From Swiss-Prot:
Purpose: Specifically methylates the adenine in position 1618 of 23S rRNA.
EC top class, as a word: transferase
InterPro entries: METTL16/RlmF, rRNA_lsu_MeTfrase_F, SAM-dependent_MTases_sf
Record-linked Gene3D superfamilies: Vaccinia Virus protein VP39 (3.40.50.150)
Main localization (coarse): cytoplasm
Biased composition (Polar residues): 204-214
Any one GO MF annotation of this record: 23S rRNA (adenine(1618)-N(6))-methyltransferase activity
Keyword Cytoplasm part of the UniProt annotation: yes
Pfam families (alphabetical): Methyltransf_10
Entry keyword set: Cytoplasm, Methyltransferase, rRNA processing, S-adenosyl-L-methionine, Transferase
Name of the protein described by the UniProt record: Ribosomal RNA large subunit methyltransferase F
Region (Disordered): 200-222
GO biological process, one term: rRNA base methylation
Amino acid sequence: MKAENNSQKDNLHPRNLHRSRYDFELLISNCPELKAFISINKHGIETVDFSNPLAVKTLNKALLQTYYDIQNWDIPKNYLCPPIPGRADYIHYLADLLAETNNGKIPEGNSVMGLDIGTGANLIYPILGNSIYNWSFVATDIYKTSIENASKIIEANPRLIDAVSLQQQTEPRFIFKNIIIPEDRFTFTMCNPPFHASAEEANKSTSRKVSNLNPKEKKNTNPVLNFGGQNAELWCNGGEIGFITQMIYESVKYASQVLWFTTLVSKKENLSSIYKTLKKVNAVSVKTIEMSQGQKNSRIVAWSFLNNTEQKSWKF
């Protein structure tokens, strides 16, 4: 299952609302504070400074308000600020995956229950999943501040109150343990795992991003503050492959309670190891869904312990 190539913006999913250039006039009409961050680039096109964290956060606020009817979205300083178009792609490709075992029809409504691992202070996946397909979510995080901020977003948007529940993972060494209980039944799990294996590696990567976005700027002495992200959002022992490997092993215990386990995989070189681990735990179905946003290529790896008959009999 591979993302379609197309000549439009960023090769985004065909149902993604952000395939065209940003309509800044529309965005500013809904979020006037965005106007202060708009400038004209060398090609005479309106843009924002993507190396400015406040500009990116305000753009996100405007996008969420304009296209997803989310009010008063905000995140604390130094927390990860997600790019909305790419996050929406994960949701849309998940919808396509679910449609495969639902007679080609995307299941919508609150009976579709997702588990978002590491939702962050931004709560972005539950927001998008509920706004686009009316799905329900359990959203988890190890940080109390993230849970508290996500709770504020929910309280400011009545449609989310009954659709999204929050749960703090009190034992950070675990992913699903303490979260999935015997009576739970999840249509899917999703995760954007920590990318790096150390804080030093994360800092170096962020420095490169800042330099690439704004090469004229002097070297930033604290680059992580530009892009945001708490430690567990950016790195963990073992990096991306370590986190995903643990997730796969933990998923075995909940094999009959989840239709599809899924995760983003940023590093293509990790796929071989992931496939070997999935074979080792006897995953019945494994799918790789390629995605592309601009110059960035990533993919979703999805696995299920249910056979084809069990998948098709899953009640949405």
